[in-house]
């Protein structure tokens, strides 16, 4: 078992962790190796704009909207800002009793910046405690923007209502992370079957891409 930070491979979520459990039989004397850390941190711009990870800007798609009052409040928050960037009277009104409690509460009224990774996505894009507002437009991320942040290919289709699609994406492990875990398992299996004098590796990692 190993705790993997999502920075281990090109993903776009900030400070996310996943408990990855890979079970190996005790009678197998080959050591499984988890994916090695990746030396580059990708930001939101890498997810939503044409560049190294994607060959086009994020496609347009449906998404949630903010109620007018929340939109009016978030209009006042700059990129990479949150509730502390609001005027004090609006802070108190918007935060309610939470204003007087301890803790940073940095997810409230949070607008993501282009030059930072996204915060961990939840199953709902507009929860008050875990706000993820678009950098330029005062709205939640759309379904396809959500999917890009989780490194889903643009061809991946989600089913159900908009809220169900958000939930599917929010519950997912980032695709690139899952792929790297898969490659590490393929490497282990190839070593195992090679040791058993198998003429052919069980799986070709080239075919698994």
Predicted feature residues:
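Class I S-adenosyl-L-methionine
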Residues: 1-102, 106-108
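C-terminal target-recognition/interaction regions appended to catalytic cores
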Residues: 68-209
